[in-house]
């Protein structure tokens, strides 16, 4: 690997603090060389916020770094080890096709993982080729950047490069590598891994590292490991509520896909709900609906219980006391989630103050939307802009009754109607990454090499709350189909 290390002024300022952990947590590994890397898409706003050099990253040397052909001098590429409950079944996992180059320290002192996804085989590949296809990598780029624009914590996408390879999936597909940026890649599954195969000392090392990286205030607490658990629970309660508020269905909420930082990660089989239905499932492999839209809060609580189990040896020397502490912490999730969700739903309806009956008002609207097959995003958009006549709810008796109750509710607060409208506009996106529009962009890019469709989509998605007539195209529902939209774990 030494001959591949280069000094190129990309602006990357890499450290490798994760390698200070015991070696059970990672394996050093070089990226596979690729024959003909070309830049497909580069995230200029993210480059600016990270303090990187766009001009250099676009150069041949920069593209070689994004492809893994050249390695920044300070980088120590590693594949991270982790386990996970996949559809409730525990299994050993790890980075099977991704490598962490290191942690970039921004000019402001923030720390972000820089990971190459699709960079070749690792010891954790489990028979896979370690490669990634262009379509799924572009899909992750689109969805993750849309999530960021919506104000939802997420990993980010810095770049996608094509590799010049054809990789075998359901057919021969063009290969690609995505550069992912994350607060960290520490997962619930990372803790499960060391809990199952490591020592208590190694578990403590991971917990201490996580406190240092994400929850430094924990060192001042009487029980820092309880603080760690509580903070992760709070972050996940906030995150899942934000998913629900925009109709996002993750699709594969395995414990290895729940981050300790509270960021959304892994955009494989995800999609956004069109017609409101709590049972909405997109993933082709989720045949029993375990990860359906309406079940996501319950799954999050289940995953957090698995995290709590791993921390038992650190929570209290007495096993029974440790279990009580963990159970009390996890039991807080439901209330925390509900408070976040109710607060967000009030905002979507222009409500500033709290009343006990608000939950019934919200649930009644959702029930009516479900009954009549109303589009989730467009219904709230119609309420925001007073054009409900454009929805399927227009002239429905139940909705008329609900609408009057809502208008009456708005009078029981000090804020003006104008203030309510402004709150609704900032809480109800006009545009989301509709599944058919995403597929349209991917087909043009992958099959025709035309990235203009994707660029226009990304431009619309970058300002989801700023309504304009140009966004109407991206707000239209898909044509009725006998085949429901399905997603696959390509990313």
From Swiss-Prot:
ATP binds at residues 94, 96-97, 117, 129-130, 180, 187, 266. InterPro entries: SelO. It is an enzyme of class 2 (transferase). Its EC number is 2.7.7.-, 2.7.7.108. HAMAP family: YdiU_SelO. Nucleotidyltransferase involved in the post-translational modification of proteins. It can catalyze the addition of adenosine monophosphate (AMP) or uridine monophosphate (UMP) to a protein, resulting in modifications known as AMPylation and UMPylation. This is Protein nucleotidyltransferase YdiU. The gene is ydiU.
């Amino acid at each position: 690997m030494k001959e591949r290390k280069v000094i190129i002024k990309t602006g990357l300022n890499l450290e490798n603090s994760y390698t200070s952990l015991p070696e059970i947590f990672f394996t050093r590994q070089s990226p596979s060389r690729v024959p003909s890397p070309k830049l497909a898409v580069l995230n200029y706003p993210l480059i600016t916020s990270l303090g990187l050099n766009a001009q250099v990253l676009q150069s041949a040397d920069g593209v070689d770094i994004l492809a893994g052909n050249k390695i920044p001098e300070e980088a120590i590429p590693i594949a991270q080890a982790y386990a996970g409950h996949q559809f409730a079944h525990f299994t050993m996992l790890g980075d099977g096709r991704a490598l962490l180059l290191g942690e970039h320290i921004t000019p402001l002192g923030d720390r972000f993982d820089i990971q190459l996804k699709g960079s070749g085989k690792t010891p954790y590949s489990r028979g896979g080729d370690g490669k990634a296809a262009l379509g799924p990598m572009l899909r992750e780029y689109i969805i993750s950047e849309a999530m960021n624009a919506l104000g939802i914590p997420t990993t980010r996408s810095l770049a996608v490069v094509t590799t010049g390879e054809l990789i075998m999936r359901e057919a021969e597909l063009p290969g690609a590598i995505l550069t992912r940026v994350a607060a960290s890649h520490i997962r619930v599954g990372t803790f499960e891994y060391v809990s199952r195969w490591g020592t208590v000392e190694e578990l403590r090392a991971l917990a201490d590292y996580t406190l240092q990286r994400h929850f430094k205030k924990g060192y001042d607490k009487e029980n820092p490991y309880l603080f760690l658990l509580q903070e992760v629970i709070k972050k996940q309660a906030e995150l899942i509520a934000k998913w629900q508020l925009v109709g996002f269905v993750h699709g594969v909420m395995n414990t290895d896909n729940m981050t300790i930082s509270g960021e959304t990660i892994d955009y494989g089989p995800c999609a956004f709900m069109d017609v409101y239905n709590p049972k909405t499932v997109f993933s082709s492999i989720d045949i029993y609906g375990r990860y359906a839209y309406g079940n996501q809060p319950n799954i999050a609580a289940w995953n957090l219980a698995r995290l709590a189990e791993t921390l038992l040896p650190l929570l209290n020397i007495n096993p029974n006391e440790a279990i009580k502490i963990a159970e009390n912490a996890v039991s807080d999730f439901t209330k925390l989630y509900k408070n976040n969700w109710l607060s967000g739903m009030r905002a979507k309806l222009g409500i500033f103050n709290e009343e006990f009956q608000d939950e019934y008002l919200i649930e009644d609207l959702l029930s009516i939307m479900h009954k009549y097959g109303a589009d989730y995003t467009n219904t709230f958009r119609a309420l925001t802009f007073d054009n409900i006549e454009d929805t399927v709810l227009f002239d429905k008796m139940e909705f008329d009754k609900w609408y009057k109750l809502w208008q009456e509710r708005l009078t029981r607060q000090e804020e003006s109607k104008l203030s309510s409208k402004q709150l609704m506009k900032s809480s109800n996106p006009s545009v989301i990454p509709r599944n058919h529009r995403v597929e349209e962009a991917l087909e043009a890019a992958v099959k025709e090499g035309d990235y203009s469709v994707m660029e226009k989509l990304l431009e619309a998605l970058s300002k989801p709350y700023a309504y304009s007539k140009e966004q109407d195209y991206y707000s239209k529902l898909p044509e009725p189909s006998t085949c429901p939209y399905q997603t696959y774990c390509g990313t």
